């Protein structure tokens, strides 16, 4: 089973490969391989979609880190994220760099949401 229901978007492939390695399986990399989604459409990258993307990338990263590397490692990553992105968020807010401000805010929000047990929205 490739899916972990706690990973809403992103990091599924990392989780899957780490589980295979844990089960003693070998991962083979084929850099020449190409994959194409059969019935895929792209939505325009609105501010809301960009927010959800950044949020889910960070939340999933923290979840997979704790799942495979333990609580201490995930706490270290949380501290690194907050120490890096809180000052950047404040700076980008002060100099009116909206796009960067919203990205950093999404990262901080996802990190805090993870700490307080809020899971990704699936709608």
Where are these regions (language model features)?
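A short, conserved alpha-helix in the catalytic core of glycosyltransferases
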Residues: 1-34
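Flexible, glycine- and charge-enriched loops at secondary-structure boundaries
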Residues: 7-10, 47-54, 101
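Residues within alpha-helical segments
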Residues: 18-21, 62, 112
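Active-site donor/metal-binding and catalytic loop motifs
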Residues: 23-48, 60-61
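A generic structural signal for secondary-structure junctions
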Residues: 40-43, 69, 91
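Non-catalytic, C-terminal membrane-associated alpha-helical segments of glycosyltransferases
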Residues: 52-60, 71-123
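A bilobed periplasmic-binding-protein/Venus flytrap-type ligand-binding module shared by bacterial periplasmic
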Residues: 64-66
């Amino acid at each position: 089973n490739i899916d972990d229901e706690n990973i809403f978007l992103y990091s599924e492939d990392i989780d899957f490969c780490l589980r295979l390695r844990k089960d003693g399986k070998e991962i083979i990399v084929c850099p020449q391989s190409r994959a194409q989604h059969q019935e895929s459409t792209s939505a325009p990258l609105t501010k809301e979609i960009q927010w959800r993307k950044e949020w889910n990338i960070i939340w999933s990263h923290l979840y997979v880190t704790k799942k495979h590397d333990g609580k201490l490692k995930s706490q270290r990553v949380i501290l690194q994220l907050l120490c890096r992105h809180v000052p950047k968020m404040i700076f980008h807010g002060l100099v009116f760099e909206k796009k960067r401000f919203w990205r950093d805010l999404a990262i901080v929000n996802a990190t805090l949401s993870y700490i307080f047990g809020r899971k990704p929205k699936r709608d």
